[in-house]
């Protein structure tokens, strides 16, 4: 079976600091992987390298057997369509209402019209147990737990084949941590 994601001997340094030192891993379709490590151990650097936000110093990163290291942004478009991402800080735009944050990729990358994009946002928000009363709010008006849910809705809105979560429960109380973990399990099954 061909790996969905394959990293081979991936290295990344920042000045004298070696962050990724020969990382090798394969993740098959349908498989989940949790990467655990201390602060500064390279978890986020590895994710950003897979996402194409950082370029490794050496090594290979393949998605569906397609080399992504060195691939121009334009060449990544079909790969990026397969990927959803929930960033640690949510990475929502306060200048946009919740629904436009959720449907951001569909509007910006796919040229979806606003009516369809709003419907897409409603559906994704429903999947993370949020209602339509939030659609026109700014993310700045949301609680921490709601902010994470909106970020999760954005990550799943395009129904990606691959979803990355970078510390999705950081900063949440234990009850909201359980809620977010439950929603993640439900959304990725």
Question: What annotation goes with each model-predicted range?
Answer:
Residues 68-84, 114:
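ABC ATPase NBD coupling module
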Residues 51:
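Helix-to-loop junction immediately C-terminal to a conserved catalytic motif
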Residues 159:
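Conserved catalytic motifs of ABC-family nucleotide-binding domains
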